Swiss-Prot record:
Note: Negative results: does not block voltage-gated potassium channel rKv1.1/KCNA1, rKv1.5/KCNA5, and rKv1.6/KCNA6.
Family affiliation: Belongs to the short scorpion toxin superfamily. Potassium channel inhibitor family. Epsilon-KTx 01 subfamily.
Tyrosine amide carried by residues: 55
Signal sequence segment: 1-26
Entry protein name: Potassium channel toxin epsilon-KTx 1.2
Segments passing through the bilayer: none
Amino acid sequence: MKFSCGFLLIFLVLSAMIATFSEVEATVKCGGCNRKCCAGGCRSGKCINGKCQCYGRSDLNEEFENYQ
């Protein structure tokens, strides 16, 4: 009985560690999407499937200034 409880406890601890580290890795990959997209002209960015996707037009401010 002690062996099965110890095995179960080790299994639960390892599964919690794996789940925690996988979440941390996902946030690190997409942590700076808005900064990366803003570096080439301010656009919004979203993390999709672990990759940073930039949306919007970078020349929108120039067109607005020309319009006025």
